[in-house]
From Swiss-Prot:
An example Gene Ontology CC term for this record: precatalytic spliceosome
Organism listed in the record: Cryptococcus neoformans var. neoformans serotype D (strain B-3501A)
Protein name per Swiss-Prot or TrEMBL: Pre-mRNA-splicing factor PRP46
Coiled coil location: none
WD repeat placement: 180-219, 222-261, 264-303, 306-347, 349-388, 391-429, 440-473
Compartments (UniProt record): Cytoplasm; Nucleus
Primary gene name: PRP46
Entry-linked Pfam families: WD40
Transmembrane parts of this sequence: none
Length: 473
């Protein structure tokens, strides 16, 4: 339907206006006002807050006040503690403080507006673009580029204070040389009571010596190849031995006879260790496996596999990791005895790991190989690396630690080093002098152990002798 405007005379005044199909006028006005606010609201600050957003803010504030009304203020005791004497404040950097107090017109980061301003004022000197303006360039250049601050000096003093000084350790001297073996002395074990010690050598004989006099007390024969490991039980009168003939034997020291054999290794057995609190024996050998034995039933409880080369040394302790093994594949593995699985593999060594030593009281151990930085200290139970023992450039065959934090390392070339275990610094170097007696006598240290008091050190070497070193009072 269409309508037309007519004049009083009845004639039409113009074209007809179609009223149908047009949107309501109120909707058009509302849409136009919204566009106007969006375009001009930023300059005129006339944009009104949306009612729904304001209502949500009020609702959230009310819920927070209701939810946390009981914990908004601290109890009087805690308030008194927080308002106590304040500690030393962290020193502030002058450059940051100066830039913060320069005023609101100072901009730390330059933008397009800053570039326009600099181009419009040619008299202005161009400054370096940096996050924080450095206001001591003259002094920095005058000191030759070595700007010192209170913060750096404080850090240096703190670092110097952290350095641990080594303990004083008396000197060690050779006090006795014992001969009697007809081959290289490859294994030594100390009696828990420090009355006697046992040695094994390439002559396939185990000899038991009196520690005080150095006299031979007993010789045990039974192995048919070089003896590589010895261990004395702390809780039983048993002596355990392993050799390159794949045999692991248990000797009864009351009858001086073999009472048990442990069969399972496919090649020579190079090391063994007795658990201090369990009736468990651990061995490692050339078949790259670590085997866990029941001491009484001779059962092979676990065969721990993972090494890819000869296992050079194994150690046990009564806390995790209860078994530690070092191998010719340049790795040290920490084993979980309860699960029979590897807990961690340490790959810091570059060459074969030949020796391990566990600290008697501190929760740590050391490992040794050949080459530079060849002795490393680790923290149990994760095997966290602590530090290197630098200075013994040789193939390390044996390590021993006593309760007075003295670490001994013996090498293939006959050099001996005594270290302060806490700092990793050497305090004495010795040289193994080969004793005359045969044409093939040469310098070289293969095994070592401290007695229970930590004042005597026993070593076995390539000159077929046993040497006893004593701490000088």
């Amino acid at each position: 339907m269409s309508t037309s405007l007519e004049t009083p005379s009845g004639t039409s005044a113009g074209p007809s206006i179609v009223a149908s199909g047009l949107p309501p006028l109120a909707d058009l006005v509302r849409a136009g006002s919204k566009r106007t606010r969006v375009v001009y609201g930023a300059e005129t600050s006339a944009v009104e807050d949306d009612g729904l957003a304001r209502a949500n803010k009020i609702k959230l504030a009310t819920k927070l006040a209701i939810e946390y009304k009981d914990v908004q203020t601290l109890p009087p005791i805690l308030q008194a503690q927080q308002t106590g004497p304040a500690g030393p404040k962290r020193p502030t950097q002058p450059s940051i403080a100066a830039s913060a107090t320069a005023g609101p017109n100072v901009k730390l980061i330059g933008g397009p507006e800053a570039e326009k301003a600099s181009s419009s004022t040619p008299q202005a000197v161009a400054e370096p673009r940096s996050l924080v303006k450095f206001r001591h360039q003259e002094g920095f250049a005058a000191e030759g580029g070595q700007a010192t601050s209170r913060l750096s000096q404080a850090l240096m003093r703190k670092k110097e204070a952290r350095e641990v000084k080594p303990e004083y350790h008396p000197e060690w001297k050779l006090t006795r040389v014992i001969s009697g073996h007809m081959g290289w002395v490859r294994a030594v074990a100390m009696d828990p009571g420090s009355q006697w010690f046992a040695t094994g050598a390439g002559d396939r004989v185990i000899k038991i010596w009196d520690l005080a006099s150095g006299e031979l007390k007993l010789s045990l024969t039974g192995h048919i190849s070089t003896i590589r490991g010895l261990a004395v039980s702390d809780r039983h009168p048993y002596l355990f031995s392993c050799a390159e003939d794949k045999m692991v034997k248990c000797w009864d020291l009351e009858t001086n006879k073999v009472i048990r054999h442990y069969h399972g290794h496919f090649s020579g057995v190079y090391s063994l260790s007795v658990h201090p609190t369990l009736d468990v024996l651990v061995t490692g050998g050339r078949d790259a496996s670590v085997r866990v034995w029941d001491m009484r039933t001779r059962a092979n409880i676990f065969t721990l596999t993972g090494h890819t080369s000869t296992v050079g040394d194994v150690k046990t302790q009564d806390s995790d990791p209860q078994i530690i093994s070092g191998s010719m594949d340049s790795t040290v593995r920490l084993w979980d005895l309860a699960a029979g699985k590897c807990m961690n593999t340490l790959t810091h060594h570059k060459k074969s790991v030949r020796a391990l030593a566990i600290h008697p009281t501190e929760y740590s151990f050391a490992s040794a190989s050949s080459g530079g930085n060849n002795i490393k200290k680790w923290k149990c139970p994760e095997g966290i690396f602590v530090n290197n023992f630098v200075g013994h450039e040789a193939i390390i065959n044996t390590l021993s630690i006593n309760s007075e934090n003295v670490l001994f390392s013996g090498a293939d070339n006959g050099t001996l080093t005594l270290w302060d275990y806490k700092t990793g610094l050497p305090f004495q170097h010795l040289k193994d002098i080969p004793q005359p007696g045969s044409l093939d006598a040469e310098a070289g240290v293969f095994c070592s152990t401290f007695d229970k008091t930590g004042t005597r050190l026993i070593t076995g070497g390539a000159d077929k002798t046993i040497k006893v070193y004593s701490e000088q009072a």
